[in-house]
Amino acid sequence: MSSRSASFLLRPAAALYGVVMSLRNHLYDRGAFKSWRSPIPVVSVGNITTGGTGKTPLVDWIVKFYEASGIPTAIVSRGYGRQTKGVQLVSDGKRILLGSRDAGDETAMLASRNPGTIVVVAEERVEGVQFLMREFADRLPGVIVLDDAFQHRKIARDLDIVVVNAGTPQELDAMLPAGRLREPLPGLSRADLIILSKITDDAKAAPLLQKLRETGKPVLRSKIKPGKLVKVDGSENGATEPAVKALAFAGIGAPEGFLHSLEKAGITVKATKFFRDHEPYTEAAIRSIIEESKRQEFVPVTTEKDWFRIADNPQLTEMLAQAGCRYLTIAPEFLDGTEELEKRLLSVLETKVVNWPLSPP
């Protein structure tokens, strides 16, 4: 069965899901469902589709902006793909306490990239925020960044940022499970700011850009900038290596973006192996990657997020280190609106912190 046929058959379920999400949003908008408001300013970064929008690099950029501005910051994330449940402290801002298996690959990467930041995972973000306020009452953060929380309306936010992938406009055509929309497009009316990410061609992105601007919300444009190609054995941490002939492997939501970043870095991709988003790597999968790389004399290259998923397993780590594996770092690069984003990020700091403890929501 073709993917188009499968999508058509799933349309009734998608329509029902859309009705449920619309009703849920309506009840929140009318006040029938309540959102708890944190006394610490909250910035939410989320998306309206599943996976692959560039949300995590943006969270990293925002945290670094606040820290550079002298504002202590905390991250609260769901920790997608983790094997733990409930509230877990990933980093206390002094040391990293959990790896990707217990924190989720994206959260583990954010904690590693921001060693001075408190990082908590919790399915219920309210519980995560209240936990960090209890546990860190002597050094409360000045702002909390929620990772992937646009649909998590149990907690109010002072700034709601939505990231949309410019490379896959067709994802906005159908609800889950027929498509990748998490909620109907009118939900974008809740956003304070929309970022059209991963732009590789201005002309191709123009129709989606116009569609997003019709929401009346400010729309910023960004692309992904490739960074360093890092050897996983730690022997080198420098610039990219254009001479590398790569076997690219990844388990992410939009692997075509990874391939584009490798191309922009001047790396020649000779072969690919892709897995499902957040899928755990097995010894057999890694062995297959290494064997093909050796046979073809290619270098195995993956994403930084994938590497954090692998790094919890010493055996797989050693296998890839001996094979000369690298991972590519990335960062968002704004094509316009940087000052607008920074202005809005600073404006939320006008919210005052009140005394803890608070009444439960």
Swiss-Prot record:
ATP binds at residues 49-56. It catalyses: a lipid A disaccharide + ATP = a lipid IVA + ADP + H(+). Keywords: ATP-binding, Kinase, Lipid A biosynthesis, Lipid biosynthesis, Lipid metabolism, Nucleotide-binding, Transferase. One of its GO terms (cellular component) is plasma membrane. The keyword Nucleotide-binding applies. It is an enzyme of class 2 (transferase). Pathway: Glycolipid biosynthesis; lipid IV(A) biosynthesis; lipid IV(A) from (3R)-3-hydroxytetradecanoyl-[acyl-carrier-protein] and UDP-N-acetyl-alpha-D-glucosamine: step 6/6. It comes from the Bacteria. GO terms for biological process: lipid A biosynthetic process; lipopolysaccharide core region biosynthetic process. GO terms for molecular function: ATP binding; tetraacyldisaccharide 4'-kinase activity. InterPro entries: LpxK (IPR003758), P-loop_NTPase (IPR027417). Its EC number is 2.7.1.130. Belongs to the LpxK family. Transfers the gamma-phosphate of ATP to the 4'-position of a tetraacyldisaccharide 1-phosphate intermediate (termed DS-1-P) to form tetraacyldisaccharide 1,4'-bis-phosphate (lipid IVA). PANTHER family: TETRAACYLDISACCHARIDE 4'-KINASE (PTHR42724), TETRAACYLDISACCHARIDE 4'-KINASE, MITOCHONDRIAL-RELATED (PTHR42724:SF1). This is Tetraacyldisaccharide 4'-kinase. It comes from Chlorobaculum parvum (strain DSM 263 / NCIMB 8327) (Chlorobium vibrioforme subsp. thiosulfatophilum). The gene is lpxK.
